[in-house]
Amino acid sequence: WASQVSENRPVCKAVIQGKQLEGLVDTGADVSIIALNQWPKNWPKQKTVTGLVGIVTASEVYQSTEILHCLGPHNQESTVQPMITSIPLNLWGRDLLQQWGAEITMTATLYSPMSQKIMTKMGYIPGKGLGKNEDGIKVPIEAKINHGREGTGYPF
């Protein structure tokens, strides 16, 4: 999973206890928060004494009484004990993002915006290598000056 910063919010899917949920990737949140209207009624939760503080303070806050099994966007195994409150969408916080191996990469603009757009459309993910398993070369190959003409086929 990769997402460039744009007008669209970075969302991804996770599977918690077999239930697929979509959430906003939120590196500013210490813990993951599930929207109350998406929390299954049969999953246990308890009211917390501590509130959630962010831009707005949430008043009715719950936490899962159990540590839940979770699969990240690339089936990364993880566990989470999320908070639950009335928010418009789920938030994947650093508690999950760290387990998923999330990275924030700010690449230097070595290439024109047009060439970057073309590469992205072709499936290139910034910070990953090229190739089927994204494990190929991650940085451009640098040309090396060969002053001795060795290996060029030039007669000495």
UniProtKB/Swiss-Prot annotation:
The keyword Lipid metabolism does not apply. Residues 21-96 form the Peptidase A2 domain. GO terms for molecular function: aspartic-type endopeptidase activity; nucleic acid binding. It catalyses: Processing at the authentic HIV-1 PR recognition site and release of the mature p17 matrix and the p24 capsid protein, as a result of the cleavage of the -SQNY-|-PIVQ- cleavage site. GO terms for biological process: proteolysis; viral translational frameshifting. Its EC number is 3.4.23.50. The active site is at D26. Pfam families: G-patch, RVP. InterPro entries: Aspartic_peptidase_AS, G_patch_dom, HERV-K_Pro_peptidase_A2, Peptidase_A2_cat, Peptidase_aspartic_dom_sf, Retropepsin-like_cat_dom, Retropepsins. Gene3D superfamilies: Acid Proteases (2.40.70.10). Autoproteolytically processed at the N-terminus. Expected C-terminal autoprocessing not detected. The sequence shown is that of the processed Pro protein. Keywords: Aspartyl protease, ERV, Hydrolase, Protease, Transposable element. Belongs to the peptidase A2 family. HERV class-II K(HML-2) subfamily. Active as a homodimer. Intragenic, in the first intron of CD48 gene. This is Endogenous retrovirus group K member 18 Pro protein. The gene is ERVK-18.
